[in-house]
Amino acid sequence: EYNNAKGVECYERLKGKAAKSAGPIHTMSTGISYALIDKSAQDKLPLAMMGYGRTDAVDGSVFPYAFPLVTTYQMQASAIVKFIKDKNGGNLAGKKIVYLYHDSAYGKEAIIAMEAEASLNKFQLVQIPVAHPGNEQGAQWLKIRQEKPDYVVFWGWGVMNQTALKAAQKVGYPRDKMIGSWWTGSEEDVVPAGDAAKGYMAATWNVAGKDVPVIADIEKVVYGAGKGNLQDKSKIGTILYNRGVSAAVLSVEAIRKGQEKYGKGKALNGEQTRWALENLDITDARLKAIGATNLLPQIKTSCDNHEGSGKVKIQQWDGAKWVPVSDWIEGNKALIHPLFQASAKQYAKEKGITPRDCSKEK
């Protein structure tokens, strides 16, 4: 259920505990993040928005307590365009790309990036919204059939995802020309679509599978000892399971970083956790040390970059599993980050916020 009010209610219940011992609060929703941005800053409790929005919170000078870590919708969209461009000999001029999106804050976040990429790369962009929940897409796919796009970039959520894949099959649109966001790229999105999903691609900021050492260790040490609480153990190693482990990695690494500064074993408050999130430096060497090699990309945050990476991989569903078909791809930072900064500057103006001087932050 996509319900922002319940997310705010959950935050209000938790914030008393969080103020005393605050790890980052994972909202798991762009809409909930928007609802909590101002409130969490007032409460001095950091929000972790891994892979989602509000995307202009990359600018920590304006949003000190909001962290769209790893990547954002706009950088993800840019990386998808780069992947398509590389598939077409580095030239998208004259191509047509449909942006099919969930008509919500989530779906709308990437529009500005797609428009910027279309202007830069000279391709035609066709925007097609889908009303929530997305289980009716007949009109949208009729339009796609009429438009005959070279690619469909897909920003779906929930039942919208399997519906789109089945609709694409029905109108004869090739699924290997569809590339979705990470909210459209889990096993739960493709398995219900059956054969209609085969060949479909999606971006991801974490890999699937059990060949990541920490995932294999969890299965062996935790579930092997009968201590796990996951009823369906086949979920271990899936995209969403590994994403949860990725969130745990970043949360624990933030606490470790904070304790390096404020005292080993110390329960951090919100301000101290905020500092830690803003000073993350998770290198490949560190990922290897904790058994998370290739689980997610390197992360290095700062006052003016609360994202820390901007990279995704593209994966393809082969009918049984997700298979990576790219290395880590970084979106066009030179194109996209000024969009964040302009949006953050406008937000600061509207809210009467004086941005921090990042040159003075350490």
Describe these PLM feature segments:
Residues 12-20, 37-45, 85-90, 115-123, ...:
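Sec-exported extracytoplasmic/periplasmic mature domains
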Residues 47-49, 53-58, 133, 174-193, ...:
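Venus flytrap/periplasmic-binding-protein-like
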Residues 12-26, 31-49, 59-67, 146, ...:
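Extracytoplasmic "Venus flytrap"/periplasmic binding protein-like
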Residues 229-241, 252-327, 331:
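Segments of small-molecule ligand-sensing domains
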Residues 6, 12, 16, 55-56, ...:
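Extracellular/periplasmic Venus flytrap/periplasmic-binding protein
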Residues 1-4:
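Acidic helix-start/capping segments at beta-turn-to-alpha-helix junctions
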